[in-house]
A protein has these predicted regions:
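Core segments of cupin and vicinal oxygen chelate
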Residues: 12-51
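N-terminal beta-strand motif that seeds the catalytic metal site of vicinal oxygen chelate
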Residues: 1-21, 69-72, 123-140
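Vicinal oxygen chelate
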Residues: 7-16, 43-45, 61-86, 106-111
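Conserved active-site tyrosine of GNAT-family acetyltransferases
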Residues: 20-25, 87, 112-115
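C-terminal "cap" of GNAT-fold acetyltransferases
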Residues: 2-7, 38-52, 109, 133-140
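Short beta->alpha transition motifs characteristic of CBS
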Residues: 55, 102, 120-127
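Short, ordered coil/turn segments that flank beta-strands lining enzyme active or ligand-binding pockets
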Residues: 49, 90, 113
């Protein structure tokens, strides 16, 4: 029997939950839902995307070590482009500008204050003809 999984909630290692949350809210447009640095964990969200920010004491012995990459799958090239422009205007730390990749993703990358990256993409492989997918290395 297959299980239907809910949305994944990645844990992002940060040096300070409060400072990281401020960046995610003020620059990247997330909402800060709960938590603080004293407790070691905080929750942020934007639409259906939820993430946990955790500091070193919280992660000691059982948490991830950074930096990490979180992939955010958007619904169109236009959404990717619009988000890139919005985050660029907000002075997000752009790691890689938006472009179509040879693996048929339109993507860009930004970093947070601790070097963790959000890799925003749209998979346009399904829009290509079977012949073009084959030539691009994505034969089915």
């Amino acid at each position: 029997m297959l299980t239907h999984f809910p949305q994944a909630v990645p844990e992002i290692p940060v040096s300070n939950v409060d400072k990281a949350a401020e960046y995610y809210v003020n620059v990247l447009g997330f909402s800060f839902d709960w938590g603080n640095d004293d407790g070691g964990i905080g929750g942020i969200s934007q639409g259906d995307c939820r993430m946990f920010l955790t500091n070193a004491p919280f992660r000691a012995g059982h948490g991830p070590h950074g930096p990490v990459i979180v992939w955010l799958n958007l619904n169109s090239k236009q959404e990717v482009d619009e988000l890139f422009e919005r985050w660029k205007a907000a002075e997000a730390k752009i790691v890689e500008a938006v472009e179509d990749k040879p693996w048929n993703l339109r993507e860009f990358r930004v970093a947070d204050l601790d070097g963790n990256q959000l890799r925003v993409f749209y998979d346009f492989n399904w829009e290509m003809s079977e012949e073009r997918r084959y030539r691009a290395g994505g034969a089915s």
